[in-house]
């Protein structure tokens, strides 16, 4: 359908990935105009967009389907192209930037949790952003707890000091934004379990992996974020 309308989806995707801040600003007026006039022009993409809203991006389809249809993958590709023509809801930017905001929000966890516990805040987020039942941040700080337990950070400098035997008996935990900030106790339980198994535990300093960006169709930002994370992981894998 996009091809019949004269739209090269692959080229549109390439442009969006390469788009910088200025490109985003230049296309803003066009996206505003398209969004305001969307009811006046038939675009089948709107129906696809509504259907894709029901995808949880869990990839169960890819695991269960005999031909491995990956709905989350083409959903993110569709969202990238779709929002090249139409405005995104504010919710997309909040979800996409979650990994980058969490370390800052964790510093004021009591205030954040107190606000989210208010009914009027939950109602405002539900009606204004389409978000409800947002989880509360863990009161405990993984970083502080690890420091108190004497658990070393996994860095090239710290791993370079290990002997071959020590490396064979060591394990590195790569932090996930949501587990570390919403389920800190689970992270510490894993550290304790591995320690009791006589393994030396190292924890990689937290850094975003870009998954929320990929889910919301910010594929250009996702690729840049994922490449940075992959570079960090490759540096540790050398040891």
Report each predicted region and the residues it spans:
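Iron-sulfur-cluster electron-transfer modules
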Residues: 14-15, 24-208, 213-239
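Internal glycine-rich alpha/beta core junctions
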Residues: 1-28
């Amino acid at each position: 359908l996009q091809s019949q309308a004269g739209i090269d989806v692959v080229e549109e995707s390439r442009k969006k990935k390469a788009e910088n801040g200025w490109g985003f600003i230049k296309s803003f007026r066009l996206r505003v105009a398209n969004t305001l006039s969307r009811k006046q022009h038939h675009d089948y993409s709107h129906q696809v967009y509504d259907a894709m809203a029901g995808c949880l991006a869990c990839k169960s389809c890819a695991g269960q389907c005999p031909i491995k249809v990956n709905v989350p993958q083409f959903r993110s590709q569709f969202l990238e192209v779709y929002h090249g023509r139409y405005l995104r809801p504010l919710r997309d930017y909040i979800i996409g930037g979650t990994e980058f905001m969490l370390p800052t929000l964790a510093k004021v966890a009591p205030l954040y949790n107190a606000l989210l516990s208010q009914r009027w805040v939950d109602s405002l987020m539900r009606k204004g952003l389409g978000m409800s039942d947002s989880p509360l941040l863990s009161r405990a700080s993984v970083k502080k707890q690890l420091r108190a337990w004497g658990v070393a950070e996994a860095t090239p400098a710290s791993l370079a000091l290990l002997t071959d035997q020590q490396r064979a008996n060591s394990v590195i935990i790569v932090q996930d934004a949501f587990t570390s900030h919403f389920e800190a106790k689970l992270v510490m339980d894993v550290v304790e379990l591995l320690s009791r198994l006589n393994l030396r535990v190292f924890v990689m300093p937290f850094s975003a992996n870009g998954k929320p960006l990929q889910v919301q169709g910010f594929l250009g930002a996702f690729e840049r974020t994922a490449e940075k994370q992959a570079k960090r992981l490759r540096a540790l894998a050398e040891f």
